[in-house]
From Swiss-Prot:
GO terms for biological process: tRNA splicing, via endonucleolytic cleavage and ligation. GO terms for molecular function: calcium ion binding. Signal peptide: none annotated. Keywords: Calcium, Metal-binding, tRNA processing. Activates the tRNA-splicing ligase complex by facilitating the enzymatic turnover of catalytic subunit RtcB. Acts by promoting the guanylylation of RtcB, a key intermediate step in tRNA ligation. Can also alter the NTP specificity of RtcB such that ATP, dGTP or ITP is used efficiently. InterPro entries: Archease (IPR002804), Archease_arc (IPR022952), Archease_dom (IPR023572), Archease_dom_sf (IPR036820). The keyword Electron transport does not apply. Ca(2+) binds at D12, D138, I139. Pfam families: Archease (PF01951). It comes from Saccharolobus islandicus (strain M.14.25 / Kamchatka #1). This is Protein archease. HAMAP family: Archease_arch. Belongs to the archease family.
Length: 139
């Protein structure tokens, strides 16, 4: 199963992420976002940021997850390549760690700045193979 792919969207970037579990799909969604920003294969999981989020549904939880990661990019220039998380669908909570390092122009390719997560075309679908998450980020 592929982890994520991009799809065409006027002036923004569409991402479709896959996972056998919801956690894997959320992780791959985040990886897709950071692949827009830089080549994540060159991002070493040196530091981590702990993340605790509450949402009112899965879509809101995904929105907050991506926004939280973008906050760390905007405020600390952190880029991430590895994610360990747990999602409790009963309480609609996410907790985990995002692993990466500070962006370094000598090591990391500067691609496109992701301004924000959006609710545009946001969907989380359970399939026979796991989960498919579709969303658009503002660039």
């Amino acid at each position: 199963m592929r982890s994520f792919e991009f799809f065409e969207h006027t002036a923004d970037v569409g991402i479709r992420a896959y996972g056998k579990s919801l956690e894997e799909a959320f992780s791959n969604a985040a990886l897709g976002v950071f692949e827009v920003i830089t080549d994540t294969s060159k991002v070493k999981p040196i530091e981590y940021r702990e993340i605790y989020l509450n949402g009112y549904d899965l879509e809101n939880l995904l929105y907050k997850w991506i926004e939280e990661l973008l906050y760390y990019y905007d405020s600390e220039l952190m880029v991430f390549s590895k994610f360990d998380l747990m999602i409790d669908q009963d309480s609609m909570t996410l907790e985990g760690k995002a692993w990466g390092e500070k962006f370094n122009g000598k090591i990391h390719e500067r691609r496109t700045v992701v301004k924000a997560m959006t609710y545009h075309q946001l969907s989380i679908e359970k399939t026979e193979n796991g989960y498919v998450i579709t969303f658009v980020v503002d660039i």
